[in-house]
């Protein structure tokens, strides 16, 4: 019995010590450093409106369907962050072809003057997460004609808006040149008022 207690006592102490260190101390230290060094990122890169209300995140895409606004990528999960993921069909899967054809048909209804051959792939395919907040500058540019026609905002103004909101590759190396759809639409909304 005494031998059993002598073995259990250090095991219990070590378990409790690591529980406190890994479950409490480490997360608090990491959170504290993140809040001090990069508060915006640590809080989820939230975007606020003029009333200081959260309207979205720079990191999570939103579904824009109003033809006056720029549209983002297709999302098979309808931009529900808790369901992050995508079907990620193989190129040989007939379901991928059906999904892309459906996206192209929807595109043609909203943008009848833009030839299908000019539609960038990111407007008719899912991202891996289904939550991608960005599109390519070309994907934004092919929507200019529709938005200009509906809103009477000159194409030159919309193209400048895209240029102003275009972000380069991270550190000049990682990723692609991109436009955050939510930020772009917030700037567009200022012109619509």
UniProtKB/Swiss-Prot annotation:
Pfam family membership, one: KdpC
Function noted in UniProt: Part of the high-affinity ATP-driven potassium transport (or Kdp) system, which catalyzes the hydrolysis of ATP coupled with the electrogenic transport of potassium into the cytoplasm. This subunit acts as a catalytic chaperone that increases the ATP-binding affinity of the ATP-hydrolyzing subunit KdpB by the formation of a transient KdpB/KdpC/ATP ternary complex.
The UniProt record lists the keyword Ribosomal protein: no
One term of GO molecular function: ATP binding
Keywords: ATP-binding, Cell membrane, Ion transport, Membrane, Nucleotide-binding, Potassium, Potassium transport, Transmembrane, Transmembrane helix, Transport
Official protein name in the record: Potassium-transporting ATPase KdpC subunit
Family indicated by similarity: Belongs to the KdpC family.
Coarse class of the protein's main subcellular location: membrane
Gene that produces this protein: kdpC
């Amino acid at each position: 019995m005494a031998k059993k207690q002598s073995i259990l006592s250090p095991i219990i102490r070590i378990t409790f010590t690591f529980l406190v260190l890994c479950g409490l101390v480490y997360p608090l230290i990491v959170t504290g450093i993140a809040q001090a060094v990069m508060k915006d990122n640590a809080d989820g890169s939230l975007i606020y409106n003029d009333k200081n209300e959260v309207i979205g995140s720079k990191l999570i895409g939103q579904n824009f369907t109003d033809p006056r606004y720029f549209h983002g990528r297709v999302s098979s999960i309808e931009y529900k962050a808790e369901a992050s993921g995508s079907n990620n069909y193989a190129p040989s899967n007939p379901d991928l072809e059906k999904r892309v054809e459906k996206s192209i048909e929807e595109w043609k209804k909203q943008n009848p003057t833009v030839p299908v051959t000019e539609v960038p792939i990111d407007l008719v395919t899912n991202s891996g997460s289904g939550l991608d907040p960005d599109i390519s500058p070309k994907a934004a540019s092919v929507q200019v004609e529709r938005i200009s026609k509906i809103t009477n905002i000159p194409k030159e103004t919309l193209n400048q808006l895209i240029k102003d909101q275009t972000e380069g590759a991270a550190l000049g190396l990682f990723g692609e040149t991109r436009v955050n759809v939510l930020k772009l639409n917030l700037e567009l909304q200022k012109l619509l008022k």
